[in-house]
Amino acid sequence: MPKPVANQEDEDPTPYLFVSLEQRRIDQSKPYDSKKSCWIPDEKEGYLLGEIKATKGDIVSVGLQGGEVRDIKSEKVEKVNPPKFEKIEDMADMTVLNTPCVLHNLRQRYYAKLIYTYSGLFCVAINPYKRYPVYTNRCAKMYRGKRRNEVPPHIFAISDGAYVDMLTNHVNQSMLITGESGAGKTENTKKVIAYFATVGASKKTDEAAKSKGSLEDQVVQTNPVLEAFGNAKTVRNDNSSRFGKFIRIHFGPTGKLAGADIETYLLEKARVISQQSLERSYHIFYQIMSGSVPGVKDICLLTDNIYDYHIVSQGKVTVASIDDAEEFSLTDQAFDILGFTKQEKEDVYRITAAVMHMGGMKFKQRGREEQAEQDGEEEGGRVSKLFGCDTAELYKNLLKPRIKVGNEFVTQGRNVQQVTNSIGALCKGVFDRLFKWLVKKCNETLDTQQKRQHFIGVLDIAGFEIFEYNGFEQLCINFTNEKLQQFFNHIMFVMEQEEYKKEGINWDFIDFGMDLLACIDLIEKPMGILSILEEESMFPKATDQTFSEKLTNTHLGKSAPFQKPKPPKPGQQAAHFAIAHYAGCVSYNITGWLEKNKDPLNDTVVDQFKKSQNKLLIEIFADHAGQSGGGEQAKGGRGKKGGGFATVSSAYKEQLNSLMTTLRSTQPHFVRCIIPNEMKQPGVVDAHLVMHQLTCNGVLEGIRICRKGFPNRMMYPDFKMRYQILNPRGIKDLDCPKKASKVLIESTELNEDLYRLGHTKVFFRAGVLGQMEEFRDERLGKIMSWMQAWARGYLSRKGFKKLQEQRVALKVVQRNLRKYLQLRTWPWYKLWQKVKPLLNVSRIEDEIARLEEKAKKAEELHAAEVKVRKELEALNAKLLAEKTALLDSLSGEKGALQDYQERNAKLTAQKNDLENQLRDIQERLTQEEDARNQLFQQKKKADQEISGLKKDIEDLELNVQKAEQDKATKDHQIRNLNDEIAHQDELINKLNKEKKMQGETNQKTGEELQAAEDKINHLNKVKAKLEQTLDELEDSLEREKKVRGDVEKSKRKVEGDLKLTQEAVADLERNKKELEQTIQRKDKELSSITAKLEDEQVVVLKHQRQIKELQARIEELEEEVEAERQARAKAEKQRADLARELEELGERLEEAGGATSAQIELNKKREAELSKLRRDLEEANIQHESTLANLRKKHNDAVAEMAEQVDQLNKLKAKAEHDRQTCHNELNQTRTACDQLGRDKAAQEKIAKQLQHTLNEVQSKLDETNRTLNDFDASKKKLSIENSDLLRQLEEAESQVSQLSKIKISLTTQLEDTKRLADEESRERATLLGKFRNLEHDLDNLREQVEEEAEGKADLQRQLSKANAEAQVWRSKYESDGVARSEELEEAKRKLQARLAEAEETIESLNQKCIGLEKTKQRLSTEVEDLQLEVDRANAIANAAEKKQKAFDKIIGEWKLKVDDLAAELDASQKECRNYSTELFRLKGAYEEGQEQLEAVRRENKNLADEVKDLLDQIGEGGRNIHEIEKARKRLEAEKDELQAALEEAEAALEQEENKVLRAQLELSQVRQEIDRRIQEKEEEFENTRKNHQRALDSMQASLEAEAKGKAEALRMKKKLEADINELEIALDHANKANAEAQKNIKRYQQQLKDIQTALEEEQRARDDAREQLGISERRANALQNELEESRTLLEQADRGRRQAEQELADAHEQLNEVSAQNASISAAKRKLESELQTLHSDLDELLNEAKNSEEKAKKAMVDAARLADELRAEQDHAQTQEKLRKALEQQIKELQVRLDEAEANALKGGKKAIQKLEQRVRELENELDGEQRRHADAQKNLRKSERRVKELSFQSEEDRKNHERMQDLVDKLQQKIKTYKRQIEEAEEIAALNLAKFRKAQQELEEAEERADLAEQAISKFRAKGRAGSVGRGASPAPRATSVRPQFDGLAFPPRFDLAPENEF
């Protein structure tokens, strides 16, 4: 196998190709709602999966997975595929086809390491950026010869499809691997080539191939060479192909590899001398520098530092993903495999290194001149040495080249820049020509001169590129990709639909909008970019500027794809124009395009190169004209444009057009490579990048055309030829291929929508052709099986006939020997023996003479035959030589014909192009005419519209007049309103003036006050200073009071909110604890249920084992019966043998004459015994047949009766289910009544004090409920009685099941016999098929002999005619010459007659041979017909046996299913009963806890009522305080001016406090939301638990119904089977024992069921109570919440009324105590949760111990299984020993049989006694044989018992493993719950810590305020004590401080700033 496929490890590729079953189950179990699931756009992920929550008009609310909800327009919402299409292999199969679905499928497959996906007709490959083992030898074998739908998506599947299409359709194929740069095209191309080399590998290997590698290896090894010299690192790709290549892989007629050739396109030469910072040059430069091949660096004169060579070190010099040393070794090995000589390799390396050295040649400016001169000769010397030329001459030609001016050559001096440019051009030219020479050399190596029939082309073109700097190379690359995309679009969307129309298929043309013609025309059409570039290249004075201007003037604004470039970013070069390609808009910089297009070289240096000593350098420049014009192609090879001047763009266009022509002549296969991200990281998908590529590549449109259209098609003759095997008789008389194809398709019963019949082809939808192939394979399989059976039948008949002939011959020989033994002692016979030889003595001599004469004649004939044979051989040799010559000439003609065909194909393609152009022009003309007609129609419409508009204008004028009148009215109203506004403005101005006057008055008063203060200060400075200090202190005091008031207000609000929040948290904590306790009880009950379930499973397993043992016993009895039958049949066979032997003895006695009377009596006795044996045999056969018929009849009757009984049981089960459903409905009604009662009771308890009289009504309702419960108890008893009846019926059903199992075993034995017969028939069919093949081979040989004989006969006929002609000539001569020559004529006549006689004899012999061959042929044909009939009969027998086998299988399967269903339903009902009993006990406990909680709530309700009363009292006090404050406000009205500033400060403080309140409310709402969310989660958990119980109850009801039906059916079957009980007495005994055990079990189950029923009823009552209690708790919680809201309102009002600091301080202390208590309760809850956590840990440890015990049990079971396996092997060995003993006994019997024959030979002498002894001995031997057979049967039974025991142990082991898995799942769930509890504890602690921190902060602020107030009070007291006497201006302050009150604002009283009342007044 070629190395790129085989050198990887053969790892299992399955995980990288298939979606595992487990993952598929996970994917398909994802939640999905077809109406709600949707995709919405996202900036980062492209699309997000969500669920529609609500719809409001065009806006849709979509909930995402993280809980986020987004509102989005409905048109942006996309549908979602069902989960079954998750990670689908072919996206054409998706039900919903849109961009998000395609993106999601590709992304999920990429994440699952599945990089290949089908997209309709083509394959999408995403670059994984890492190695996957999907290209190994093992993987390649998976895809070899497989259809696309049989294997997962892969590049190998596409490759194999192309290979098969090439061989099947005889059409050249092409594989177009496209995509952007870095998408993985080159790697996929290498894998494709390696695969084709593997598939087409030839098995022949000769010595020459071994020395340089096979053709397959050579094809593969071209990749390393081309990659080394043509690939480089770019920004987007570390191994980017910087050239395009089209590799043709040629195959011979048999599909074997016959050679290859490579075409390359546009190597990026500029990369040789310049690279960007993040890129590097071609790999070969860095590979040579790695030095991995010894001696190369020395040959190339290279150093170890890459930076010594500037032209290859301008960017990156190393690549992380590429090992240059290893790659260089592979490149060097590839040279060897491709047949490069050592000299050629070294020359390649030298030229490559010389390019590196040329970049280091240095030059400088000479003095004051413009000319350059060399700056050192070191690098130039190395270049000259490597090139094999003179250094001085090289520098001379570079600095002063000779140029041609007119007809003369002149020397031109160049400056440094010109010389540098010239060296760069030489570097590029040398490397480009070296690359082309390498390609040419590879093509020569791959040209094997073998016969080529078809090829597969693989295209690898550089992908679409958008860089920061895009030049001429990028334009050419992008133009190529544009053409390929257009080709793809044309193939997929245009040609496909045009072919539908051309073929007459009903099809509506779909315009996918994928036409790229405008962009292509912009580049390549006349006056396009390339044409303008070539035109500018012709003009000597043209520059880049003129080229840019011409482009802009020609296309800007006139061609849509030609656009202005975007402004450059900082540091970037400006672009000159931009083109809108299919993959995006690209900005191009045209700097240097003219030089690149001209590609000039220094002709003087080229001439020097052509004279160098490096042969390779001379060869690569051999086609360059140079200055002398002596190139190989100078005469006519490049005679294009302008006298031999050819540009790079024109050559590239020609290559591209040739490529497109080649692709159009092939059948294309597309592979789309996708780059997932720009970072080259594996497993990362950039959604927008991938979506852009999908849109550009037409992936969605390709899927749509594949789904809507008919991608597969075949010509009618081809279809008929390939699929005529499906219905050969139906199309036998049809000559029209179309009609025949239609008949063939209709015979397959395909849906008409899956195919269409065109004029010349039949079209199929995707995947249908694969179904046709499956039909064909199935048909071929049947035919081959029939042929094999026919041949085997023929061989069997032939062998049987031979045995019959041998038997007859043996009898004849035996008879003759017996006669001889009788006659040998007879004297007369002895005399006759002596006399007979003497009678023939006289005739011996005559016989000898006759034989000698005959021998002589034979020798003469032999000599004549030899002579004729030699002549014929010579003639044959001559004819063979002529044939060889004709074949040679024919092959030459074929080659010429192939050339003509290729030319014809090219002309046809050109014709098609012209026709397409003509068609396009005609279509455009039609479109223009349509447009003209449309314009005319539009003109008419416009005239009509104008007339209508005129009418509208008139109407509008009338409306305008009316509007003007309305306007006048409105203007009058507006003037009135303006007057009113002016009046209001005057009032406002008056008010403003009054306000201003009031302000001035206030200001005056302030000024007077200030003047008075100044006067006082002037009179008493010290006093003024003290007063000033007092004022400052008072201001500080006022501020402190305000701050304290604000703080106190905030503190009161925060504390009130905190208290409310803590109360709500406490309630929630209590609810949480209750729910947690309920969950814990549920978990414990679940564990107990699980334990009981396991116990029941153990019991079920025990019963199953008992059933299996009984079945095994029945099987043993059946086997014993069968053994008895076999023994009986064997005895009958031996009896028949004895009868036959008696007949033979009778014949012998008759021959001997029967001389004695004893012999006569013996004969009579023997005949009597024989007749008796015959009668016994016939009677036994008749009895056996009658018994068999009775058994069959009984079996059929039993089956019918069982079916009827099953139906009756099903009916009874349905009836019981109906009754149970009725009871269940009554139970639900009772529960509803209980719930209503609970609600009434709760309401009565809430208003118990006011509504005490309603208690009697509640009591009456309770009595009614008790009566209902009593009725329910009665119904329960009734149900228990019915349940006991059902159990009794179940017992009867189990007995019937045991009988059915016996019948099933008998059917199984019959099935095994039928299978054995079918196997024997299949073997006979195989034998007949082999014989048939041999006969065909013999028949072919005979036909060849007949043809050879016919040819020989024809030759002899020609010779005869020739002889006749010669005779005629001689006769004419004789008549003319006369009698003179009569003697000569006579002699000639005799000769001719002799020759004529010989010819006639030869003809006669040949005719005889022909006649014999004809007879042989006829005989063989008759035998073939006989064999055909035998095969038909065998097929009929086999089909009948298969039908019987299927019928028996079906019957057995139905009974198995019925028995399994009954057992499963019984187990399920028992399990559910146990579950309900445990649930009942659990609900009882929950009910008791609910009662306790109810009492606690009552007490709490009473406490809250007391608190409410206290609060109402406080509200009254608050009202009185408000009245006092209102009086104080009136007294302080006079101080309004003085306190205005304080009012403003109070307003600001109020705003701050309101903000704080809002923040606190926001925090409170968040806390409430969190609490509500947790409550909702708990409610959902409880609801899920309730639903689970309800589902279990429903399943129990269903199982009870099934049991009832099964019991009824079993009763009916029992009645019908009673008639057969007498015939099955032995089985009845065993069944009675099993029935007794079953009765015991049923009684036990009945008792358990009664207990379970009782427990179930109790559990239901408890559950109803718990549900009622839950409802009461919920209503109580709602009522408490309402009361809390009311209390909160009252409390806030009370707080606003109590603004004294003493009350605030007391509240603060109370709040501190409450927070401490709350903290203590939270700590207690934490400790409780920790204890629960420890309990859960202990439960987890117990579960782990149980799991360990289960594992130990499993290990024990495995040990037992191993022990039983050993016992099984021992039993098998014993059985083999018994078999050997049986064979030995059979051999002994055979020997005794021989002795019996000898004894019979002596019977005449021995008489009657000897016969009796022998018969006695025979009977003894038969007894021994029977005993031995019984022992053998016992051994077989023991063996089967052991096997069954092993199976049981394995089953038990599997059950243990499943139990272990269930335990592990339970452990995981408990661990998850533990984590949830921990998280809840942490959240509660965080809430408590937050509340405590808030309280401490408030308390701290309060203490600080109190300290500041105390200090201020002390200071004021001191200053007032000192300055009380002199306080003149302050004496007007009337109010004492104890009653100082804030002013009123907006109707609310502010709390007092401060109060100095002592603490004992609090």
Swiss-Prot record:
Q: Which GO terms describe its molecular function?
A: actin filament binding; ATP binding; calmodulin binding; microfilament motor activity; protein homodimerization activity; structural constituent of muscle
InterPro entries assigned: Kinesin_motor_dom_sf (IPR036961), Myosin_head_motor_dom-like (IPR001609), Myosin_N (IPR004009), Myosin_S1_N (IPR008989), Myosin_tail (IPR002928), P-loop_NTPase (IPR027417), XRCC4-like_C (IPR014751)
Gene Ontology biological process terms, A to Z: adult somatic muscle development; border follicle cell migration; epithelial cell migration, open tracheal system; flight; locomotion; muscle cell differentiation; muscle contraction; muscle organ development
Q: In which tissues is it expressed?
A: Expressed in larval and adult muscles. Isoforms containing exon 9a are expressed in indirect flight muscles, exons 9a and 9b are expressed in jump muscles, exons 9b and 9c are expressed in other larval and adult muscles.
The region called Actin-binding is annotated at 656-678
What start-end ranges are recorded for coiled-coil regions in this protein? 802-1927
Region Disordered: start and end of each range? 1822-1862, 1922-1962
Q: Which residues bind ATP?
A: G179, E180, S181, G182, A183, G184, K185, T186
GO cellular component entries: A band; cytoplasm; myosin filament; myosin II complex; polytene chromosome puff; sarcomere; striated muscle myosin thick filament
KW Nucleotide-binding (keyword) present: yes
- Report the domain of life of the source organism: Eukaryota
**Pfam families in the record:** Myosin_head (PF00063), Myosin_N (PF02736), Myosin_tail_1 (PF01576)
- Where's it found, cell-wise? Cytoplasm, Myofibril
Which UniProt key words apply to this protein? Actin-binding, ATP-binding, Calmodulin-binding, Coiled coil, Cytoplasm, Motor protein, Muscle protein, Myosin, Nucleotide-binding, Thick filament
UniProt entry tagged with the keyword Acyltransferase: no
Matching SUPFAM superfamilies, A to Z? Myosin rod fragments, P-loop containing nucleoside triphosphate hydrolases
Q: Where is the Myosin N-terminal SH3-like domain?
A: 33-82
Where the record annotates domain Myosin motor, the positions are 86-777
Residue span(s) of domain IQ: 780-809
Q: Which PANTHER family match?
A: MYOSIN HEAVY CHAIN, MUSCLE (PTHR45615:SF27), MYOSIN HEAVY CHAIN, NON-MUSCLE (PTHR45615)
Assembly information from the UniProt record: Muscle myosin is a hexameric protein that consists of 2 heavy chain subunits (MHC), 2 alkali light chain subunits (MLC) and 2 regulatory light chain subunits (MLC-2).
The family line of this record is: Belongs to the TRAFAC class myosin-kinesin ATPase superfamily. Myosin family.
> According to its record, what is known about the domains?
Alternative splicing exons contribute to the specialized contractile activities of different muscle types. Exon 3 encodes the hydrophobic pocket adjacent to the ATP-binding site, exon 9 is adjacent to the actin-binding domain, exon 11 is involved in actin-binding, exon 15 in the S2 hinge and exons 18 and 19 the non-coiled tail region. Limited proteolysis of myosin heavy chain produces 1 light meromyosin (LMM) and 1 heavy meromyosin (HMM). HMM can be further cleaved into 2 globular subfragments (S1) and 1 rod-shaped subfragment (S2).
**What task does this protein carry out?**
Muscle contraction.
- This chain belongs to the protein called Myosin heavy chain, muscle
Origin organism of this chain?
Drosophila melanogaster
